[in-house]
From Swiss-Prot:
Organism: Nicotiana tabacum
Binding site for iminosuccinate: 283, 309, 392-394, 414, 513-515, 538
EC number assigned by the record: 2.5.1.72
Keyword Transmembrane carried by entry: no
Functional note: Involved in the biosynthesis of pyridine alkaloid natural products, leading mainly to the production of anabasine, anatabine, nicotine and nornicotine, effective deterrents against herbivores with antiparasitic and pesticide properties (neurotoxins); nornicotine serves as the precursor in the synthesis of the carcinogen compound N'-nitrosonornicotine (NNN). Catalyzes the condensation of iminoaspartate with dihydroxyacetone phosphate to form quinolinate.
Underlying gene: QS
This protein's name: Quinolinate synthase, chloroplastic
Length: 726
């Protein structure tokens, strides 16, 4: 008989002799306590008492009574209140794994929810909410200094979620801090409660994980307080509400200063753009002052677009079709080169393309791909055939052209690189893939595929339908990546930053660009597994934040969402605009719950310029300025808060270009994005050969397959050349 039935029939047992035990007991024996064997941890205890025989009866005494009652607490709290947490976990795992049917596991959770001690209403505050749960979950954590043990209270407005909380409280309430911190989220996977094979399974698994992460974060804080360790300084952040923004810290104040630009400057720029028929395409990473003005000017002149590098050229073509005679590119040089080449291909050679500086606007990543070392890497690694070079879009046309003549090449973005590589492996047997130039992204791709090799075929198929564990394991030794190329911005997310995020922001939403170092990548991937993170492009990051905000608004409860921004701080302008629009719309339409969104800048201690201000009397005052003091300004441990190259795209330069057109073209010759006059080693035009890998990518994005032309290039003999024009 299972424990659930025993609980239901306890009243019956109390009224009748127990059929499970012999009645031949010693008269007047003291009461005995028995525990019925059961996998159900809330115990059913039975007390048997023997009574003297009835003197009026002629029959042998058989009047023992056996009373059973359900005990509404966990066995670990009854007999071994301080049993090791790992031992409790094994008991809990055994219990749930013994339940074959998913519905039985749900019923068990529902029963556990009835055992969870009630939480006082005063603890159900927004500060005690557990982030990342689809239902409301509250957690209160305290520390018993005398016993050196943690105390946990939890509650939820969902009965199933209360069951999850009850299990975790039973494991960790009364545990030492070390025991709490030693438990890993993957340790909970064996409980198999998430294996319901139905809607909501992932969110159920996320509940285990997110409640545990919050328990651990608050445990660390209490232990640090007890040991007298000063709390680490919080990262700067911006809090966005329907009423506006609130910067936290000097760095955030510097960012926020430009989000609400002077209206006269906005009007002046918009009027110039309209008068001169100038379109503007700008990258997310440019200077926040310029972004603020451009974002406001979009309302007055529609031909302004801020995006990642891939979309910039497409928007430039759209602007040319709409009648723009000039395009101003706010980005690094390879972006303006790409815009120039794509406009030419689209039939708009007469449209002028202008950079924002008369000096070179470089890029550490593009420079790495233009080095002799990169071409040597391609020559060495491509000795095996068939081979394909997958090159990051953030490289020059020259790099794409020279590479394509060495190895068949397709470009990629951080949002489509995984699908591009997996599709290539699926379509071309025994393919060798050479990725470059970003070392961090290459390492992260390899790590992702390694993780996939341990997934189930069903999980792998959800990522790419043509792969399984066997195919993923077989492709790992055939994936290669360049070892000496990094973006100086994403290099900042190194050990120091990751340690602080893990310590103080473990329960926040984590966003990371695919180019960040491995530690930050792993941290964000772990968060992604429990629905609390995203790894991808700038557009992926923006979409993730908007989706989480929309979900929160739909829940219609007061909530504070915290996002760690694991990419260049210039993204904040687009984020504030998008989030502010969502919050403002909800506030005006419903007047319901208040949702606030905090964007955290994980700034390395070496990533800011500190300058004294004012007179010598103000020596103790320090201003924190986004960016670096000079040059690239990056330490060995990562120190760029923002891209120094992107910051060359100043508002004054943009105004100068606009004011000089059309009659001052001669003065702007150094600003113009020129066409390539050089040819490839095979004598072809750089623009023609360099654009072909981009066109291959566009075909892949449209069809989800490699173009037939590229497959033919991969399979053809190596000495026949690579481009279609060869």
């Amino acid at each position: 008989m299972d424990a659930a039935n025993l609980v239901m029939k306890s009243s019956l047992f109390s009224k009748s002799p127990c059929p499970l035990f012999s009645s031949k007991l010693i008269p007047r024996a003291p009461p005995s306590v028995f525990t019925l064997p059961s996998t159900f941890r809330p115990l059913v205890k039975c007390i048997q008492a023997s009574f003297p025989p009835n003197p009026d009866s002629k029959k042998p005494s058989n009047n023992s009574t056996f009373t059973c009652s359900a005990v509404t607490s966990f066995p670990s709290q009854q007999s071994q209140p301080h049993a090791p947490s790992d031992a409790k976990l094994q008991l809990l795992i055994s219990e749930f794994q013994s339940l074959v049917e998913p519905m039985d596991r749900v019923k068990r959770l529902l029963h556990y929810s009835t055992l969870l001690p009630p939480m006082d209403a005063s603890f159900k505050t927004p500060e005690n909410r557990v982030p990342g749960c689809t239902t409301q979950v509250w957690l209160n954590v305290s520390f018993d200094e005398a016993e050196n043990r943690m105390k946990f209270l939890a509650d939820s407005d969902s009965e199933i979620t209360k069951g999850f909380c009850a299990c975790l409280v039973s494991l960790l309430d009364g545990a030492t801090p070390d025991e709490v911190l030693a438990l890993k989220t993957e340790d909970l996977n064996a409980l198999n409660v998430a294996g319901l094979n139905g809607k909501g399974s992932a969110s159920r698994a996320n509940t285990w994980h997110n409640v545990l992460v919050s328990m651990q974060k608050r445990t660390r804080a209490l232990v640090a307080e007890r040991e007298g360790r000063p709390r680490g300084e919080l990262f700067p952040s911006l809090v966005i509400t329907a009423d506006g923004i609130q910067p936290q810290g000097s760095y955030a104040e510097a960012q926020a200063r430009f989000l609400f630009p002077d209206e006269s400057r906005v009007q002046k720029l918009a009027s110039l753009l309209k008068e001169k028929k100038i379109g503007v395409v700008a990258h997310f990473y440019m200077d926040p002052e310029v972004q603020g003005v451009l974002t406001a000017a979009q309302k007055l002149w529609p031909h302004i677009h801020i995006s990642d590098s891939l979309v910039m050229a497409d928007k430039a073509v759209s602007m040319a079709k709409a009648g723009c005679e000039y395009i101003s590119v706010l980005g690094v040089d390879f972006m303006s080169e790409n815009v120039r080449a794509i406009l030419d291909l689209a039939g708009f050679p007469e449209v002028g393309v202008y950079r924002m500086s008369d000096e070179r606007i470089g890029c550490s990543l593009a420079d790495a791909a233009a080095s002799p070392a990169y071409l040597d890497y391609l020559k060495t690694a491509s000795t095996s055939s068939p081979s394909l070079h997958v090159v990051y879009i953030n490289t020059s046309l020259e790099t794409k052209a020279y590479s394509h003549e060495l190895v068949p090449t397709i470009t990629c973005t951080s949002s489509n690189v995984v699908q591009t590589i997996l599709q290539a492996f699926a379509e071309v047997p025994d393919l060798e893939v050479l990725y470059g130039p970003d070392t961090y992204m290459g390492s992260n791709i390899a790590e992702l595929f390694t993780q996939m090799s341990t997934m189930t075929d069903e999980e792998i198929s959800a990522i790419h339908p043509l792969h399984n564990r066997i195919s993923i394991k077989s492709l790992l030794p055939r994936l290669h990546y360049f070892q000496d190329g990094t973006c100086i911005v994403h290099h900042l997310f190194g050990h120091e930053v990751v340690e602080k995020i893990n310590e103080m922001y473990g329960d926040a939403f984590l966003t990371a660009h695919f180019e960040v170092p491995g530690e930050m990548f792993s941290l964000a991937m772990e968060a992604k597994k429990r629905g609390m993170g995203v790894v991808g492009s700038t557009s992926n990051i923006l979409d993730f934040i908007k989706e989480r905000v929309e979900e929160s608004l739909n829940r219609n409860v007061d909530e504070h969402l915290q996002f760690v921004l694991g990419t260049e701080s210039g993204m904040i302008t687009a984020i504030v605009a998008a989030v502010g629009k969502l919050l403002g719309s909800a506030d005006s339409s419903s007047g319901g719950a208040k949702v606030s969104v905090e964007i955290v800048f994980p700034v390395s201690s070496e990533s800011v310029t500190r300058t004294s201000t004012g007179s010598p009397l103000d020596q103790n005052k320090v201003n924190i300025i986004p960016g670096v003091a000079s040059g690239e300004g990056c330490s060995l441990h990562g120190g760029c808060a923002s891209c120094p190259y992107m910051k060359m795209n100043s508002l004054s330069s943009l105004l100068k270009v606009c004011q000089s057109l059309p009659h001052g073209k001669a003065e702007l010759s150094a600003y113009e994005a020129g066409r390539f006059s050089l040819r490839t080693p095979k004598g072809k035009q750089i623009a023609d050969v360099g654009c072909e890998p981009v066109l291959h990518m566009r075909h892949f994005q449209a069809t989800k397959r490699l173009p037939e032309q590229l497959i033919n290039q991969i399979l053809q003999p190596r000495d026949n050349g690579r481009s279609s024009s060869a």
